[in-house]
Amino acid sequence: MTKSNFVDYAKIHIRSGKGGKGSIHFRHEKYIPWGGSDGGNGGKGGDIILRGSRNYWTLLHLKHKYHIFADHGKAGEGKLRHGKDGQNKTIELPIGTAVFDGTTGKFITDIKYDKQEIVLLKGGRGGRGNNYFKSAVNQTPKHSQPGEPYEERQIVFQLKLLADVGLVGFPNTGKSTLLSIVSAAKPKIADYAFTTLEPNLGVVNVHNSYTFVMADIPGIVEGANEGKGLGLRFLRHIERNSLLLFMIPSDANDIANEYKILLNELACYNSELLNKQRILAISKSDMLDTKLEDVIKKELPTDIPHIFISSFTQKGITVLKDLLWEKLRFHDMKEIS
């Protein structure tokens, strides 16, 4: 996904359809000069429906849609003819989309699975025609009902990528390179900060038997929770990852402190992120010998599993994939139990 086609935010004015007006009509048939009422009911207004779809990975298809309106119900007619119902409007959304009220910011719902359907706005009911009000004492009522009004509101859609593993680290720590090595993804890679401007997804194959999805999130900087660097926009994608793989290069000045800064940024954004499983990968470690590794190990945080890796030589890559898979399996077993 590139900057031009990765869209994870959309704000749209939506409106259901109003109900059609009931008809006021009387029979005018030959030889029946005093025919009774035969006004039909109005049609129902169309609903606004949200539907989960695996056919979409981003909100790109909504990028230039500012208004989505369902059709109004048609008015009833004589001879008991019912007005045509307004057509529903269905908005297809990728799995992992959160829905908020665009005015208040209040959370409404989210899309969790394929083909999930949620009626967000209901269309108005059609009004009753005058035939509905006919009685034994009044065969020719001269009134009907208007249709019910439509509903409308501003809605914000925010996509949170669904990935098993999220890569967390400062810019230029080798996250994109790792993703390109363990999957078929082709993220942009260069020797400067903020090469990754949009999230990238890749499917990781483990021993040709199992797969999981890995997400390369743009690099975090100190103060990201306050909007620095690429800011908060991409931190929300970490919320739906089952496991966080922290990546810090072996030549960092203080690995433990960098890890602490990353944790603090996540905690300031959403403290629940600290409840996720974590693994620390020391990247760019192909130039380290055993003695240097032992020195670095003594400086590492003790509350997180760690592994030394190199995407260049593929040192530790197979072991890393196995470790990630085992952690994900353990997470799934806990979810089931």
Swiss-Prot record:
Domain Obg spans what residues? Answer: 4-162
Q: Which GO terms describe its molecular function?
A: GTP binding; GTPase activity; magnesium ion binding
Q: Does the keyword Nucleotide-binding apply?
A: yes
Q: Which cofactor does it need?
A: Mg(2+)
Residues given in the record as GTP binding sites: 169-176, 194-198, 216-219, 283-286, 310-312
**Major location (coarse):** cytoplasm
Listed A to Z, the keywords are: Cytoplasm, GTP-binding, Hydrolase, Magnesium, Metal-binding, Nucleotide-binding
The lineage's top-level taxon is Bacteria
Localisation = Cytoplasm
A GO CC term assigned to this protein in UniProt? cytoplasm
Q: Which residues form the OBG-type G domain?
A: 163-329
Record: residues binding Mg(2+) = 176, 196
- Assembly, per entry: Monomer.
Known function: An essential GTPase which binds GTP, GDP and possibly (p)ppGpp with moderate affinity, with high nucleotide exchange rates and a fairly low GTP hydrolysis rate. Plays a role in control of the cell cycle, stress response, ribosome biogenesis and in those bacteria that undergo differentiation, in morphogenesis control.
Q: Which family does it belong to?
A: Belongs to the TRAFAC class OBG-HflX-like GTPase superfamily. OBG GTPase family.
Protein name per its UniProtKB record: GTPase Obg
Q: Which organism is it from?
A: Azobacteroides pseudotrichonymphae genomovar. CFP2
What gene makes this protein? obg
